[in-house]
Regions:
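PP2C/PPM-type serine/threonine phosphatase catalytic domain
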Residues: 1-247
Length: 247
């Protein structure tokens, strides 16, 4: 089984800086989206540190199980970001979301902190793999809110877990057995807050009707179409998306 991918990050229509960072490597089987937060250059610095630290840690710790190294690589990024923030007052309080997929053998190990997401598309069905670490998601989990009520809450962007703000973090890791023709989507909230799950599925299916015949051009035009739709729907935030097809 081989991997085909395409990625794109875009500043959007309302922000003066792009605080998202992405990492994409078919060879390593590693794909990361990080959505930074923090004043001045904090968000850019945090997300950039995450996408540099995680691959380095993974490559240097292949003796660990894929599940362990997926979690520990994010924890290492958390430590690096926190330490730099403590050393440099102008960066204190910076942080980032992280969502990553690490392919090893027949499995995909999906880990996350924050509200950047991973989706799986298989046989024209879309499934959200990750769970947002947000105040809204916690209320949904407790049946306090429906998803419709949550969408209208003014505090919908408040995160309860991020990378770089606290010394100890719990990283969610999901293990999934990959099947041929599976399509994985990683994205920041600049995409999923502006483009519905059904529209994400429609755009992917329209551009990749048959995953086993897809090529790099098909994947590239898909990520371009997803970003364009987020901008057409307001483009309030930076937008990042990575698409991975298992062939």
């Amino acid at each position: 089984m081989s991997l085909l991918s395409a990625s794109l990050t875009d500043i959007g229509l309302k922000r003066s800086k792009n605080q998202d960072s992405i990492y994409s490597s078919n060879e390593e089987g590693l794909f990361i989206v990080a959505d930074g937060m923090g004043g001045h250059a904090g968000g850019e610095t945090a997300s950039n540190l995450a996408v540099k630290t995680i691959p380095k840690y993974l490559n240097e710790n292949q003796n660990q199980s894929p599940n362990e190294v997926s979690s520990n690589s994010v924890k290492k990024a958390n430590q690096v970001i926190l330490e730099l923030g403590n050393k440099m007052p102008e960066l204190k309080g910076m942080g980032t979301t992280v969502v990553q997929i690490y392919f090893k053998g027949p499995f995909a190990y999906v880990s996350n902190l924050g509200d950047s997401r991973s989706y799986l598309i298989n046989k024209s069905q879309l499934y959200q793999i990750t769970r947002d670490h947000s105040l809204i998601q916690e209320k949904i989990n407790l049946n306090i809110y429906t998803r419709e009520q949550a969408a209208a809450d003014p505090n919908k962007n408040v995160l309860v877990r991020t990378c770089g703000l606290e010394e100890n973090v719990d990283v969610d890791v999901f293990t999934y057995k990959v099947r041929r023709n599976d399509i994985f989507v990683l994205c920041s909230d600049g995409l999923h807050s502006k483009v519905s799950d059904s529209d994400i599925l429609h755009i992917v299916n329209k551009n990749i009707p048959d995953p086993k015949k897809a090529d790099e051009k098909d994947l590239h035009q898909t990520v371009v179409a997803l970003v364009a739709q987020a901008n057409a729907n307001g483009g309030n935030d930076n937008i990042s998306v990575i698409l991975v097809v298992a062939q």
